[in-house]
């Protein structure tokens, strides 16, 4: 009889402890994307040509009442009307320590490794007859959960001057 009481006590204590810890917020309820900028980043020179890479920069805020942990962000770039992916970039955005309720992190800068090349000045490349607009889909994923689409935007025909390294919260 003593063993059964002891097991019940351990089970009850474990359940109370687990209930007190609470669960992490999920991507749909917690992640708010703001301060979004799209455009083309300077991709340097390749074979004597200027390169432009479609890019998105953004910040996120935890709008939930509890922390969110382990969130990755993925930007997928496509030429409008083309089902093939032009490029994508995945970053670890929020680590194991989490993002507390009401806090924000970023900016994150994600870019395609493929874009446009030309001999003309970068600003003039937007006027070229072969230039086609690109769209970006931004996704987030928490742990082993499914990807959630956060936004879909047409990349603005503008040059961006933004930091090269994405910010991450460990």
Where are these regions (language model features)?
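Bacterial N-terminal signal peptides that target proteins for export
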Residues: 1-10
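Bacterial N-terminal signal peptides
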Residues: 10-19
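Bacterial signal peptide processing site
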Residues: 21-25
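Short, compositionally biased P/S/T/A/G/V-rich stretches that sit at domain boundaries
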Residues: 28-47
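Short, solvent-exposed loop/turn segments enriched in Ser/Thr/Gly
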Residues: 49-57
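Asparagine-centered strand-capping/turn motif at beta-strand->loop junctions
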Residues: 60-64
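Short acidic, flexible loop segments centered on an aromatic residue
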Residues: 65-85
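Short, solvent-exposed, Trp/other aromatic-anchored flexible loops in extracytoplasmic proteins
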Residues: 89-149, 154-161
């Amino acid at each position: 009889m003593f063993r059964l009481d002891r097991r019940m006590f351990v089970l009850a204590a474990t359940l109370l402890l687990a209930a007190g810890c609470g669960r992490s917020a999920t991507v749909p309820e917690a992640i708010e994307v703001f301060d979004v900028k799209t455009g083309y980043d300077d991709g340097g020179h390749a074979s004597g040509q200027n390169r432009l890479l479609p890019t998105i920069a953004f910040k996120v805020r935890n709008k939930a009442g509890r922390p969110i942990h382990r969130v990755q962000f993925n930007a997928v770039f496509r030429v409008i009307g083309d089902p093939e992916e032009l490029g994508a970039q995945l970053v670890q955005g929020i680590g194991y320590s989490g993002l507390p309720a009401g806090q924000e992190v970023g900016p994150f800068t994600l870019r395609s490794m493929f874009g446009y090349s030309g001999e003309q000045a970068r600003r003039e490349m937007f006027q070229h007859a072969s230039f086609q607009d690109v769209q970006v889909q931004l996704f987030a994923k928490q742990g082993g959960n499914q990807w959630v689409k956060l936004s879909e935007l047409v990349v603005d025909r503008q040059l961006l001057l933004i930091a090269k390294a994405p910010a991450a919260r460990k």
